[in-house]
């Protein structure tokens, strides 16, 4: 998943994540997080934006302006939900599920609250309405 915020909020989002005591991954250069029994690999450099299609990047830019992105990889949906519940409250940005949806963070959190077992890899948010 990818968390996107306006570029001017980069330090705020990074601060929320760095408080969890990340450690460098000597192999990938990314950062690792071990929290609540889960393991995460994070790319805080924002390079994931280079992988966006032009229309996707336009959608993000039209919504939040120039974006900053954090890529988060983890082992399970439970891990993903836990991370997002820890990080997203109060974030004014977007969540890219990496499964064809980019949703406002507040809406994403609301959907997770109403549908605690939601697996966005298999079920689009429009099926939850």
Features from the language model and the residues they span:
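Acidic (Asp/Glu-rich) sequence patches and key acidic residues
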Residues: 1-129
């Amino acid at each position: 998943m990818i968390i996107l915020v306006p570029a001017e909020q980069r330090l705020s989002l990074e601060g929320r994540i760095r408080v969890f005591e990340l450690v460098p991954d000597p192999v990938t250069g990314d950062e690792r997080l071990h929290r609540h029994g889960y393991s995460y690999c994070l790319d805080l450099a924002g390079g994931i934006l280079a992988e966006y299609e032009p229309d996707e990047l336009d959608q993000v830019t039209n919504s939040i302006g120039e974006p900053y992105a954090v890529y988060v990889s983890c082992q399970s949906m439970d891990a993903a939900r836990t991370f997002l519940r820890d990080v997203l409250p109060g974030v004014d940005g977007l969540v890219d599920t990496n499964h064809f949806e980019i949703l406002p963070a507040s809406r994403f959190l609301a959907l997770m609250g109403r549908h605690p077992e939601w697996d966005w890899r298999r079920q689009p948010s429009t099926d939850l309405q």
